[in-house]
Amino acid sequence: MNKIRKGDQIIVLTGRDKGKQGVVSARKDDSHLLIDGINMVKKHVKPNPMKGTTGGIVEKAMPIHQSNVAIFNAATGKADRVGIKVQADGTRVRVFKSSGAEIKAA
């Protein structure tokens, strides 16, 4: 079970975007996340008439490692750690470590 999922509100812990908040838009693999508006870089794109794209400089989000982000707890207004709790019926749910409150699915 991934502790950080698509749609989660996160906060960046390290790097040039430290302190910024965003929403996870995709998981690139088991350890990298794509976050809207975070880790933006400028890429030079060649024009390609076959695809109908014009050339130029495009700004896009690049993946960031999940160890550099933490889930944002709206109740406390701070970054928090995620734990897994097994309920009585055997299902596993994600909870905030600080409060024990269940993390709502996005």
From Swiss-Prot:
Highest taxon above the source species: Bacteria
The keyword rRNA-binding is annotated on this UniProt entry: yes
One of the record's GO molecular function terms: rRNA binding
A Pfam family matched in the record: ribosomal_L24
GO CC entries: ribonucleoprotein complex; ribosome
Keyword set, alphabetical order: Ribonucleoprotein, Ribosomal protein, RNA-binding, rRNA-binding
SUPFAM superfamilies: Translation proteins SH3-like domain
Biological process annotations from GO: translation
PANTHER family the record matches: MITOCHONDRIAL RIBOSOMAL PROTEIN L24
Family, as annotated: Belongs to the universal ribosomal protein uL24 family.
Subunit text: Part of the 50S ribosomal subunit.
Job of this protein: One of two assembly initiator proteins, it binds directly to the 5'-end of the 23S rRNA, where it nucleates assembly of the 50S subunit. One of the proteins that surrounds the polypeptide exit tunnel on the outside of the subunit.
Protein name as it appears in the record: Large ribosomal subunit protein uL24
